Amino acid sequence: GEAINKHFISESAKPQFCIVGSGPNGAFPHHHTGDRKVKQGDAVLIDIGGRKGTFPSDMTRMSVLGEPPEGYLEIHDIVERAVQAALSAARPGVMAKDVDAAARNVITEAGYGEFFVHRTGHGLGIDIHEPPYITATSEVVLDEGMVFSIEPGIYLQGRFGVRLEE
């Protein structure tokens, strides 16, 4: 997290958060700091955000130290497809719940629906989490100019988690 914070500062931005979950800790969507060291074969989930001026950023990416754990590449591919499905569905006039369904359907059809345990996305504006919320029940109609994240994930307890955030 220290290197990420230094990068934000070098870009005249203020670091806000840095979540790093390696191996089984990546299976907790908002993992808190612990003593576990990153090990060979770990999938590493990195969720970072900062603020430049008034506006926040929020991004999640994945990395692997060495060879990926069993099943990781399949899960990563499913989550990538879920992101793309949601991005394709997101356009003016569409309800937020339909964008959520686009991502959720990809994951459910692949057999991992029970492991997608959070909303698909949230608005980014003055606050890091604000409307529109991209959830299964949100009837908010998306409009041009709305800024929101798309961040589906699959979390396999005791193994690893994969989340990609656009």
What are these regions (language model features)?
Residues 1-166:
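Active-site neighborhoods and metal-handling regions in enzymes and metal-associated proteins
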